[in-house]
């Protein structure tokens, strides 16, 4: 068959785009950014791609073009974000957007059909390029995802995406994709109309060839949904609803979302050309916002973190994982190990009930994915075969690492170390999922202390992205590197932190929670305190968080922190009454809020359990300015984060920012505690703490690190390059 004949190259170029003309007069443009693992778009590529298209136009008998990646698993992962850091004005950033718009418009205007054959990540500018093509076909491979994630960087699609996508898949669907930045898998993209076909990878090119035979795409009649939304009245209602819903989620903290709605609406109502102008202008302005700078900072920090092992050693391979404890944490750790890490897991519990709980929990998690059509039943069955359990140590002789997830009891954890050293192989690493107990204490008496380490997951394990890796003084570098490698295999972001009370995340969280407690004891209603912090940018308020984590679990950490770090960690004495009243939070339906088991709180809103007020001898009445509530809690967190850096609990400011955002939901648009302090300026940070100290006591006294930085007019990150780790 002619389509299968070898290609004959007509150009050889160092460009990221190379043209090959097949014997059947179909051109194939291979995308391969030199020296990079994935394809990303750079500003200099505009001329390269237009040059390749011009070469194609010179071929008189050309039937059409296919765009396909020459890299194994990446179509185009988006634009090179470092370009934006070089922009010194909104106008410069706007010009970048205009360049992309003009380039893709020329592709759309070509006299012959163009097909995007997509395998791997097709995101951001990569999808905008694909949208400019006549047809799109993607592979059914799990590595293939499509989306416009710019909003997650505080931006909007700047190369025509806000204008092309609504016309392709409909206004409401396009707004949802652009405002959430979520990724679609192949079948989802097909159902939405984002791609024309989704096929096995091995016939991707053949399918693209068949598509080209249809010729240039003609305008298609509007579907009933699009016809309905073409009515100005209906459209007005839709935009109003979307704006209200978005505002309720963002509380005005993410300017990109409002710009997206404005730009999409402008294009729909005033035409594509006006839409392009507004898109480029809005893109330029958003690039210069502090919110986008903060989100881009997190993006670069996350990427930099992935390149470090946390230790000066190579990781040893992990083939088999043991888990002690079949509870919620143990079951969650088993889930991410099997489903993301693709590793066999052996769970040990003291009784069959614990094993069955873990297996049932994993079955339920996988069934949810099957029901959402993100997994086939056969894949669910395969993954379940990776998880087994018993009430003894059979199978643990094969374990390369054993993760302990038992009760927070030092004697019990030491017993677990001893039993693993008796029953597992000499090379087996023992990782404790403790949230508060110092690792060096757990390792006391161990025969192989160099293989004992902390591995602190956050609940729920399948959703929370962070883990803290905690070596003690005698943990080997190989153990650290291996544990970090396992965490990444589980899909986690891992930060290496010091072996001190509370580690990092819980240490900065505790004073924040305590300050909320002081506000409550001053008579401020629970819902007012929580809402103030949610408006500030946290995903949930401190009392809702306590209910979710478990009041009993959270309070176990406080004595450890108080004993080692001082009275600023001591909870108000009145809070003892909460535990004595049997309040554990959501898990027993009794906490700061009421929980109706037939409803979900996010559907109906939480209702405060007002019986807690007389328990604390408090008469609740809103009287504290919400800005002051959030300031008090956040400043306690910032001060403690600076102490952690000063004491070496975290290795650098980058790790502190990642840990706070991914571990407790510190507002991403602020970039993390250290980025936020740099933005405020040390003078403002210290001055605010001193004012609060005068009003509320010495718990607000600024730490030595902050005082010294103010004196020396220093910042945590170099002013010219926020993407480097800081001192």
From Swiss-Prot:
Summary of the function given for this chain in its UniProt record: Catalyzes the formation of a hydroxyacyl-CoA by addition of water on enoyl-CoA. Also exhibits 3-hydroxyacyl-CoA epimerase and 3-hydroxyacyl-CoA dehydrogenase activities.
GO function terms (MF aspect): 3-hydroxybutyryl-CoA epimerase activity; enoyl-CoA hydratase activity; long-chain-3-hydroxyacyl-CoA dehydrogenase activity; NAD+ binding
PROSITE patterns xrefs: 3HCDH, ENOYL_COA_HYDRATASE
Subunit and partners: Heterotetramer of two alpha chains (FadJ) and two beta chains (FadI).
Site (Important for catalytic activity): 128, 150
Gene name, Swiss-Prot/TrEMBL: fadJ
Family in the record: In the N-terminal section; belongs to the enoyl-CoA hydratase/isomerase family. In the central section; belongs to the 3-hydroxyacyl-CoA dehydrogenase family.
Keyword NADP: no
Reaction equations catalysed: a (3S)-3-hydroxyacyl-CoA = a (2E)-enoyl-CoA + H2O; a 4-saturated-(3S)-3-hydroxyacyl-CoA = a (3E)-enoyl-CoA + H2O; a (3S)-3-hydroxyacyl-CoA + NAD(+) = a 3-oxoacyl-CoA + NADH + H(+); (3S)-3-hydroxybutanoyl-CoA = (3R)-3-hydroxybutanoyl-CoA
Entries under CDD domains matching the protein: crotonase-like
Protein source organism: Pectobacterium carotovorum subsp. carotovorum (strain PC1)
Xref: PANTHER family: TRIFUNCTIONAL ENZYME SUBUNIT ALPHA, TRIFUNCTIONAL ENZYME SUBUNIT ALPHA, MITOCHONDRIAL
EC number: 4.2.1.17, 5.1.2.3, 1.1.1.35
Main subcellular location of this protein, as a coarse class: cytoplasm
Region (Enoyl-CoA hydratase): 1-200
Highest taxon above the source species: Bacteria
Protein's name according to its UniProt entry: Fatty acid oxidation complex subunit alpha
Any one of the GO CC terms: cytoplasm
Region described as 3-hydroxyacyl-CoA dehydrogenase: spans on this chain: 316-727
Keywords: Cytoplasm, Fatty acid metabolism, Isomerase, Lipid degradation, Lipid metabolism, Lyase, Multifunctional enzyme, NAD, Oxidoreductase
Matching InterPro entries: 3-OHacyl-CoA_DH_CS (IPR006180), 3-OHacyl-CoA_DH_NAD-bd (IPR006176), 3HC_DH_C (IPR006108), 6-PGluconate_DH-like_C_sf (IPR008927), ClpP/crotonase-like_dom_sf (IPR029045), Enoyl-CoA_hyd/isom_CS (IPR018376), Enoyl-CoA_hydra/iso (IPR001753), FA_oxidation_alpha_subunit (IPR050136)
One Pfam family of this chain: 3HCDH
Biological process per Gene Ontology, one example term: fatty acid beta-oxidation
Pathway per the UniProt entry: Lipid metabolism; fatty acid beta-oxidation
Cellular localisation: Cytoplasm
């Amino acid at each position: 068959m002619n389509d299968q004949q070898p290609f004959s190259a007509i150009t050889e170029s160092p460009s990221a785009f190379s043209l090959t003309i097949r014997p059947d007069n179909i051109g194939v443009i291979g995308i391969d950014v030199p020296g990079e693992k994935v394809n990303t778009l750079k500003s200099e590529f505009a001329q390269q791609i237009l040059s390749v298209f011009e070469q194609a136009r010179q071929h008189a008998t050309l039937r059409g073009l296919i765009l396909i990646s020459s890299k194994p698993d990446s179509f185009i992962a988006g634009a090179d974000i470092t370009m934006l850091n070089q922009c010194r004005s909104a106008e410069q950033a706007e010009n970048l957007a205009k360049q992309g718009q003009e380039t893709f418009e020329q592709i759309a205007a070509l006299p012959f059909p163009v097909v995007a054959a997509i395998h791997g990540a097709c995101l951001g500018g990569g999808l905008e390029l694909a949208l400019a093509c006549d047809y799109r076909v993607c592979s059914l491979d799990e590595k293939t995802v499509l989306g416009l994630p710019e909003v997650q960087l505080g931006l909007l699609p700047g190369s025509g995406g806000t204008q092309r996508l609504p016309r392709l898949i409909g206004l409401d669907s396009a707004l949802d994709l652009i405002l959430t930045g979520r990724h679609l898998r192949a079948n989802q993209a097909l159902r939405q109309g984002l791609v024309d076909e989704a096929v096995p990878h091995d016939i991707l090119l053949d399918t693209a060839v068949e598509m080209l035979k249809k010729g240039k795409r003609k305008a298609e009649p509007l579907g009933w949904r699009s016809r309905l939304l073409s009515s100005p009245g209906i459209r007005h209602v839709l935009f109003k609803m979307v704006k209200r819903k978005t505002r309720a989620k963002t509380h005005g903290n993410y300017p990109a979302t409002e710009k997206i709605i404005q730009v999409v609406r402008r294009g729909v109502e005033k035409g594509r050309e006006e839409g392009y102008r507004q898109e480029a202008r809005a893109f330029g302005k958003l690039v210069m916002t502090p919110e986008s700078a903060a989100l881009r900072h997190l993006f670069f920090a996350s990427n930099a973190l992935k390149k470090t092992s946390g230790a000066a050693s190579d990781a040893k391979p992990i083939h088999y994982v043991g888990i002690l404890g079949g509870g919620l944490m143990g079951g969650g750790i088993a889930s991410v190990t099997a489903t993301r890490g693709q590793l066999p897991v052996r769970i040990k519990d003291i009784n069959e009930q614990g094993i069955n709980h873990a297996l049932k929990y994993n079955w339920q998690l996988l069934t949810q994915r099957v029901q959402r059509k993100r997994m086939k039943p056969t894949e669910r069955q395969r993954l379940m075969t990776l998880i087994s359990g018993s009430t003894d140590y059979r199978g643990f002789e094969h374990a390369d690492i054993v993760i302990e997830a038992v009760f927070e009891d030092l004697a019990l954890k030491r017993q677990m170390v001893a039993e693993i050293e008796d029953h597992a192989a000499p090379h087996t690493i023992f990782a404790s999922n403790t949230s508060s107990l110092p690792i060096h204490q757990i390792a006391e008496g161990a025969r192989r202390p160099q293989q004992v380490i902390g591995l602190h997951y956050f609940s729920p394990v399948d959703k929370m992205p962070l883990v803290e890796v905690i070596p003690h003084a005698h943990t080997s570098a190989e153990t650290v590197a291996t544990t970090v490698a396992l965490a990444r295999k589980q899909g986690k972001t891992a930060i290496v932190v010091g072996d001190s009370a509370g580690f990092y995340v819980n240490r900065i969280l505790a004073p924040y929670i305590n300050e909320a407690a002081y506000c409550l004891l001053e008579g401020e209603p629970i819902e007012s305190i929580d809402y103030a912090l949610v408006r500030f940018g946290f995903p949930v308020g401190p009392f809702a968080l306590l209910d979710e984590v478990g009041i009993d679990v959270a309070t176990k950490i406080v004595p450890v922190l108080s004993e080692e770090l001082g009275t600023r960690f001591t909870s108000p004495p009145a809070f003892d009454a909460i535990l004595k009243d049997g309040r554990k939070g959501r898990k027993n339906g009794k906490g700061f809020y009421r929980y109706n088991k037939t409803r979900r709180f996010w559907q109906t809103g939480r209702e405060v359990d007002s019986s807690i007020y007389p328990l604390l001898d408090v008469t609740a009445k809103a009287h504290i300015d919400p800005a002051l509530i959030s300031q008090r809690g956040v400043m306690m967190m910032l001060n403690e984060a600076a102490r952690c850096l000063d004491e070496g609990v975290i290795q650098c400011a980058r790790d502190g920012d990642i840990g706070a955002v991914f571990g407790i939901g510190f507002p991403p648009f602020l970039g993390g505690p250290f980025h936020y302090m740099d933005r405020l300026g040390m003078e403002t940070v210290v001055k605010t703490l001193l004012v609060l100290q005068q009003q509320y006591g010495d718990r607000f006294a600024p730490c030595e690190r902050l005082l010294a930085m103010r004196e020396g007019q220093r910042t945590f990150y170099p002013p010219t390059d926020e993407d480097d780790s800081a001192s």
